[in-house]
């Protein structure tokens, strides 16, 4: 069985490629810059050059494949024009779906995001919750792409949508290396008590869930939240990284200042705080009161996260130390 993975040079895509390769799949990874996939190529993973912005390369790279995991996306990288970001996340998904239909692909798994739930603040959010447009590029693009995936499913393509949450672990960017580097630079601040909830998704748990979604007949036509199914506070999550760096505390700003500085009229507050605060979308998540339910994935796929937060952080710290992000004198 041969599978195409987009976004293979990314955190999630790379881990999926390695796991599927180890499970006996013939893995083909789409990479805009193949040199960034040298470690995967060294494991006999086929790397083909192409871009989500190049419709022709998306069709050609699907030759002789049986399945697709679409993990590639614009995830908020600054400096990318809005039309390019939208094309990457939405139009390219449509092109991939069309190419998959033409190639008679047997399974198509799309990695979306819990950001599709928008500003829903219910205590527990499952897959039946509405996904309204919120006027923010990233979540709105994920909602639009999901609509295309469902449409392709109605036309006969065996599709599944997976919504990850805060996925972290070895090689992770936004939820692993990012916080470590921000803490080192003194730019990561706690917002008041920072008791908003992080819906963690340790990478090995998440990959297990995606593989179940890929292989289970019960997943066809369905949408799943895939994360650890438990929460911790932002304060606890970030303080675990701080402890790895030998820090007992982090800079804190009052919550009301953070909320105000995230608004357009809050420029004076940004100067007062002396730091670049999170934007409105980030602030929403920092004060998030919700847990994303994985009951559906458990019921239909048999998904059970096996690695606890404590064990996941232990493994993550070991990788950070081996990779040189934690100095020899820093102790966790």
Language model: regions and residue ranges:
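N-terminal Rossmann NAD(P)H-binding glycine-rich loop of SDR-like oxidoreductase domains
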Residues: 3-23
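NAD(P)H-binding glycine-rich loop region in Rossmannoid oxidoreductase-like domains
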Residues: 36-41, 45-88, 99, 117
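C-terminal amphipathic/interface module of NAD(P)-dependent oxidoreductases
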Residues: 50, 232, 240, 276-332
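Catalytic helix-loop patch of NAD(P)-dependent Rossmann-fold dehydrogenases
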Residues: 87, 91, 121-167, 188-192
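Conserved Rossmann-fold NAD(P)-dependent oxidoreductase catalytic core, especially the SDR/UDP-sugar
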Residues: 95-137
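Substrate-positioning beta->alpha
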Residues: 144-145, 173-178, 192-214, 221-225
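Glycine-rich Rossmann NAD(P)(H)-binding loop
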Residues: 169, 191-196, 224-231, 242-246, ...
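Mid/C-terminal beta-alpha module of Rossmann-like enzyme folds, strongest
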Residues: 212-277, 294, 314-317, 327-330
């Amino acid at each position: 069985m041969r599978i195409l993975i987009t976004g293979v040079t990314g955190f999630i895509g790379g881990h999926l490629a390695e796991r599927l390769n180890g499970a006996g799949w013939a893995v083909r990874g789409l990479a805009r810059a193949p040199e960034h996939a040298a470690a995967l190529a060294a494991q006999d993973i086929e790397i083909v050059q192409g871009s989500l912005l190049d419709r022709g390369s998306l069709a050609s790279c699907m030759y002789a494949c049986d399945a697709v995991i679409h993990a590639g996306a614009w995830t908020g990288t600054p400096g990318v024009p809005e039309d390019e970001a939208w094309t990457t996340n939405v139009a390219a998904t449509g092109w991939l779906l069309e190419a998959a239909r033409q190639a008679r692909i047997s399974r198509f798994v799309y990695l979306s995001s819990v950001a599709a739930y928008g500003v829903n603040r219910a205590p527990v959010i499952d897959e039946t919750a509405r996904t309204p447009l919120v006027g923010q590029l990233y979540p709105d693009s994920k909602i639009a792409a999901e609509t295309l995936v469902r449409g392709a499913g109605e036309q006969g393509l065996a599709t599944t949508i997976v919504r990850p949450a805060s996925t972290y672990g070895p090689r992770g960017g936004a939820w692993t290396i990012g916080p470590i580097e921000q803490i080192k630079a003194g730019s990561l601040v706690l917002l008041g008590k920072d008791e908003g909830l992080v819906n963690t998704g340790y990478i090995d748990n998440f990959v297990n869930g995606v593989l179940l979604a890929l292989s289970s007949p019960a997943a066809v036509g369905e949408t799943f939240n895939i994360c650890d199914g438990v929460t911790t506070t932002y304060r606890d999550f970030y303080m675990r990284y701080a402890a790895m760096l030998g820090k007992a505390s982090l800079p804190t700003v009052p919550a009301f200042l953070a909320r105000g500085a995230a608004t357009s009229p809050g420029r004076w507050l940004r100067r007062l705080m002396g730091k670049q605060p999170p934007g409105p979308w980030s602030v929403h998540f920092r004060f998030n009161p919700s847990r994303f339910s994985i009951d559906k994935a458990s019921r239909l796929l048999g998904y059970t996260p096996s690695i606890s937060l404590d064990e996941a952080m232990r493994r993550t710290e070991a990788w950070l130390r081996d990779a040189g992000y934690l100095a020899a004198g820093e102790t966790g």
